[in-house]
Amino acid sequence: LEFKKIGNEKWSNFCDNKLVFIPSVTTGISYRYAPWGNPEWPRIERNPQQFKERLEFELKYLDKNYRILFITEFNNFFEEALVEPDSKYGFGMLLALKEVLEKYNI
């Protein structure tokens, strides 16, 4: 999350009340079919617990006037970046999302 924190802080500072920064979160991806990318980039593993941690992290960057958070993929089957139920985690991603939204009353 350190990599994401640095980027979010730069964008948040850049916006300085003139633009709205809308953070985004991913469930993570499977690298099985998507081996490309820079090997130095941090891997974004996919599981409900890490998705939940990323959600809670991104909520810190919500604009107080526009409480919007993008989920970058809802059903990207190619990279297995999906929120909807699947054979590996069942309803795990949706339950993680529900838990965080209820915890923060969103």
What are these regions (language model features)?
Residues 1-50, 61:
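Aromatic-lined glycan-binding groove of carbohydrate-active enzymes
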Residues 22, 44-88, 93, 100-104:
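Substrate-binding cleft of secreted/luminal carbohydrate-active enzymes
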